Amino acid sequence: SDLTPKYFFTLIDAPGHRDFVKNMITGASEADCAVLVLSAKEGETDTAVAPGGQAREHAFLLKTLGVSQIILAINKMDDSKFSEDAYKIAKEKGLKLVKSVGYKIENVPAIPVSGWTGENLVKKSENMPWYTGKTLLKSFDDFKVPEKPVGKPLRLPIQDVYSITGVGTVLVGRVETGT
């Protein structure tokens, strides 16, 4: 969908539940950038970034699949009553995680949000006057369009194969290089 004045985005939801890791891999393999969502709720970020945690697994997969640009969204700020301390704790743990998998933390914004109340998603939150950065949507404009190596031979990794009645076998993939 058309989200910002600068770019055209297609959003792919990759659920954080372990049962949907295959979907996350499929989505991430098609992505140029990502939003990694952590929780400001006490204890939830600890679980997510711990060994075996979903955020840890997702950060590793994003980096492995070539997603070089990410935003940390610190969600559930409403649960912590929009506490700056809760944000800072989750942010610190999130930045430590993404640094450990190879991201440069100076290029990773951490944005406090509430998906439940819509705080700081599109419009600045009045409940977080201590946060002076951009909203999540405005931060999308900071993503850079990655250069595509069109001068190289065609490389199209196949992600799935469908057998469609009346059509035949259809391969699904993404052109990584070439034209």
Where are the predicted features?
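Switch I (G2) and immediately adjacent beta-strands of P-loop GTPase domains
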Residues: S1-E42, K63-L65
